[in-house]
């Protein structure tokens, strides 16, 4: 029988040889998930002898990682803000940049409490906002029925109330909101081919690809958004690197004005907020 500590070393080396970033962290995460161990259990069980069935599950997880599948998709979860979010191949992995969007919405809510999450995916934005804003009325829409199943599962898991329903952007929406949030597809054609394999092959393309210039979704949203925002309503969008001026122009052409732009940890413009004037 192999010991846990030796197994971690061997699996780490496999991942390192493959050229994966942070191989030891990945190996530990996957092995803990395979054995249902939390970090404390892991420390206490490093001399544990592993049976054949345990080794088989570990090998299965490591083999998937060697094919560049993200750890979160293998173990089926990722932490976002302070919540555990279930993820699978039908939804985009929640990313740290999107936590900035949450932060800025929370800073600017005041009495604005009806919120729409456009293209909700896993539901992470709507669910965190619901957990922080209590009695707010929050809707989340997506064109993908499979993504909506994931979003509802996450809402139930985190004990929050969000109304999720299918809509192609605004097609099935019949009311106005104080706040609209969205992390739309914004990867351009030239950027898409350069994406890491873990993103390009394991996140849904519909949640990534924003057309030739990456701006198609913003144009579609901008054409209708004024009709779905209350007066003085705010809209928060995640944007791609170098897209600030183009995205702002798209929304200004539809009668919205800039409130602010915020940077991510790499000092790239990442979140833009626009307003519907009264």
State where each predicted segment sits.
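Conserved Class I SAM-dependent methyltransferase catalytic core
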Residues: 212-275
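A general structural signal for well-ordered alpha-helical segments in protein cores
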Residues: 8, 27-28, 58-59, 68-71, ...
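Conserved beta-strand segments of alpha/beta enzyme cores
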Residues: 84, 137, 161-163, 257-260
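Conserved AdoMet
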Residues: 32-108
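Residue-level signal for inorganic ion chemistry
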Residues: 30, 68, 98, 125, ...
């Amino acid at each position: 029988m192999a010991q846990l500590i030796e197994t971690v070393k061997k699996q780490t080396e496999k991942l390192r040889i493959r050229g994966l970033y942070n191989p030891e962290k990945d190996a530990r995460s996957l092995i803990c998930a395979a054995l249902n161990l939390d970090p404390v259990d892991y420390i206490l069980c490093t001399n544990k002898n592993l049976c054949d069935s345990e080794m088989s599950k570990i090998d299965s997880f490591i083999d998937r990682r060697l094919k560049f599948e993200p750890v979160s998709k293998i173990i089926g979860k990722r932490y976002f803000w302070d919540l555990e979010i279930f993820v699978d191949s039908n939804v985009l992995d929640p990313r740290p940049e999107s936590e900035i969007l949450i932060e800025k919405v929370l800073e600017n809510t005041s009495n604005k409490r009806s919120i729409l999450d456009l293209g909700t995916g896993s539901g992470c934005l709507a669910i965190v906002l619901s957990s922080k804003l209590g009695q707010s009325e929050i809707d989340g829409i997506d064109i993908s029925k499979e993504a909506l199943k994931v979003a509802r599962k996450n809402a139930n898991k985190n004990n929050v109330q969000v109304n999720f329903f299918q809509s192609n952007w605004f097609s099935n929406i019949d009311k106005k909101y104080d706040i609209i949030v969205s992390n739309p597809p914004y990867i351009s054609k030239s950027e898409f081919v350069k994406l890491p394999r873990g993103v390009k092959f394991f996140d849904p393309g519909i949640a990534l690809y924003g057309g030739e210039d990456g701006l198609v979704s913003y144009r579609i949203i901008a054409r209708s958004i004024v009709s779905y925002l209350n007066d003085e309503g705010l809209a928060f969008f995640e944007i791609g690197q170098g897209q600030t001026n183009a995205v702002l122009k798209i929304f200004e052409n539809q009668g919205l004005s800039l409130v602010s732009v915020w940077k991510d940890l790499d000092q790239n413009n990442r979140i833009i907020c626009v307003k519907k004037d009264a």
